[in-house]
Amino acid sequence: VQEADAMQILKRLLIPLAALFAGNALAQMPQGEYLDGKDSKVAVVLAHGQGLDADSHVVSPLRKAIHSELGYHTLSLQMPTIAGNRSPDTFQQYASTFPDAYTRIQAALDFLKNEKGVQRIYLMGYSMGARMTSAFLANHPGSGVVGYIGVGLLAGGPEPLNTNINLRKIRIPVLDIYAENDRDAQFAENRKAMVSDRFVQVPIAGARHDYRGYDQQVAQAVTTWLTKHEAK
């Protein structure tokens, strides 16, 4: 009997400790590039393009602009990548990485809320990162994300790769930025029926899908949209 009592006492001690460690694990910052917004209650989580990294083109200048101009927290995530060239086969294989992508996005939301006291989080994705982030929102309607920013949204492929399908399931405000001189514009044309007070499209004149040389225009579109929504 004494041994059984001892085991019960031990269990009562271990359960709170396990919960404590589990909570701390959830609050750990996922791999990526973070800029601290100090007392700001607003954050933007960013996801890079195919085969790139958390400090690569589009996401790197954008995260820095949001932080410097608006003072928000920014967390650019290292998303799953697949080694090899960017062939159509590789593109299709990325669907297998989406569960991992969802885990990383959720870890970012938990970190910002639990460790940084953030109350309002926007999610941004570029190219493959836009496929991943839009799919996350389509499949996690209760995530608490308050707005979505897509740059270079591509619509090829089946679910969950097709951003146009994903976007039809998203009910939060959306900023759809597309390059006017590339395939982005073709996919954006199919989304014009979604345009409303909630769904805004912004073309970047002269830009191609990599947006090189157009960082300022992309940042201006994003910061203007964020400022408008935070003023409501």
Describe the function of each predicted region:
Residues 215-232:
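Catalytic active-site module of serine/aspartate enzymes centered on a nucleophile-bearing elbow/loop
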Residues 124-133:
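Gly/Ala-rich beta-loop-alpha elbow adjacent to hydrolase catalytic centers
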Residues 185-199:
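Conserved loop-alpha-helix segment in the C-terminal half of the alpha/beta-hydrolase fold
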Residues 170, 176-178:
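Short beta-strand/loop motif that positions the catalytic acidic residue
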Residues 29-116:
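Serine-hydrolase catalytic machinery in alpha/beta-hydrolase-like enzymes
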